[in-house]
């Protein structure tokens, strides 16, 4: 009986560690992306110019605000 209990405790500890590791790493990645977005102003300007649009400062800032607001809405849903 002691061997079965030991195996059960080891399996439960392993499963708990995996679940905690997944949760913490996901939270860390979400915080990193929120602090340092992947799409910055220069990348957005380059993308707009490749699509044939003239990237004015007002348009770039408008698109960045839209992206940030969508990220906030998406993070609140979770």
Swiss-Prot record:
It is a single-pass membrane protein. The chain crosses the membrane at residues 3-23. Keywords: Cell membrane, Membrane, Transmembrane, Transmembrane helix. InterPro entries: UPF0154 (IPR005359). It comes from the Bacteria. One of its GO terms (cellular component) is plasma membrane. It is found in: Cell membrane. HAMAP family: UPF0154. Belongs to the UPF0154 family. This is UPF0154 protein SSU05_1707. The lineage of its organism: Bacteria, Bacillati, Bacillota, Bacilli, Lactobacillales.
């Amino acid at each position: 009986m002691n061997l079965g209990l030991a195996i059960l405790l080891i399996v439960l500890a392993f499963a708990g560690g995996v679940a905690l590791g997944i949760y913490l790493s996901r939270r860390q990645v979400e915080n990193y992306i929120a602090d340092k977005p992947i799409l910055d102003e220069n990348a957005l300007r380059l993308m707009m110019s490749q699509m044939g649009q003239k990237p004015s400062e007002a348009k770039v800032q408008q698109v960045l605000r839209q992206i940030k607001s969508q990220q906030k809405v998406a993070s609140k849903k979770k």
